[in-house]
Design a protein with these regions (language model features):
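Basic/polar, cationic surfaces and motifs that engage anionic cell-wall
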Residues: 1-83, 128, 140, 144, ...
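Secreted/periplasmic proteins that engage bacterial cell-wall peptidoglycan
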Residues: 66-151
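Flexible, surface-exposed loop/gating regions in the mature catalytic domains
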Residues: 156-161
Length: 234
């Protein structure tokens, strides 16, 4: 199925501070198409456009703004996610996806004081402002990268209370119907032992335990959550 996507419209709109208002309805349409046909890459052109605009410096970003991290609390919860994409997700792509899916809708809310303003996250990685919601990205080969400082609230769980007191681990793969590699689980366990020894095992949960989603996969609760907890004890 060919997805109708107006590349010129997106290119022009992404040059404005309120791009998320100008493109909000269009992206909602793409999301609706994606729900009707999950296998189609209906949202990919939008992600590509945002990624390119960020890379080229076309998309205006705020240089100051709301302190979204003032609600940060002591970490007592680990939330596990998957990218639901094929392995090898570039950080630039993840950044574009979360800017469009998370920050765009928030800034588009008319009740917000920052409505219509350039998007500002206040989150920085390697001296660049970033918008991804995960603190850790874990590859299937066991490489684990701490991509969001723990002092930042990651926008990942779909529940602000959980966000304020959690860190998010995301496995770089589509785990809807399969388990992550042993190397990936071992990397997560090692990172938890080293950085978050205070988190109780019952508070190591999946995204599916917070909101109605399959993430991080159908086998998380019946199978590989237990394997992760066993590795924590090893």
């Amino acid at each position: 199925m060919e997805v109708p996507f107006d590349a010129q419209k997106w290119h022009e709109a992404l040059g404005h501070p309120d791009w998320y208002i100008r493109l909000g309805d269009d992206f909602k349409r793409l999301e609706a198409l994606a729900k009707d046909n999950p296998d189609a890459k209906t949202k990919e052109p939008a992600y590509t456009a945002v990624e390119a605009a960020l890379h080229e410096g076309q998309l205006p970003l705020g240089d100051s703004g709301e302190d979204f991290d003032e609600d940060r609390r002591p970490i007592d919860t680990i939330v596990v996610h998957h990218t639901k994409n094929k392995p090898g997700m570039p950080l630039a792509r993840l950044n574009a996806m979360h800017l469009l899916r998370l920050y765009g809708p928030e800034y588009a809310r008319e009740s917000r004081p920052y409505h219509g303003q350039p998007v500002w996250s206040g989150h920085f990685y390697q001296d660049k402002q970033v918008f991804w919601g995960y603190h850790w990205l874990v590859r299937q080969d066991g490489a684990a990268e701490h991509i969001l400082d723990d002092r930042y609230i990651g926008w990942h769980a779909g529940n602000w209370d959980v966000n304020t007191r959690s860190v998010a681990f995301c496995i770089d793969d589509d785990l809807t119907e399969k388990e992550p590699s042993h190397l990936a689980l071992r990397a997560i366990a090692a990172a938890i032992r080293k950085n978050y020894p205070q988190v109780k095992q019952e508070n190591i949960i999946g995204h599916c335990d917070v909101v109605d989603t399959v993430c991080p996969g159908k086998l998380f609760k019946p199978s590989w959550r237990g394997k992760l907890l066993a590795l924590l004890e090893a």
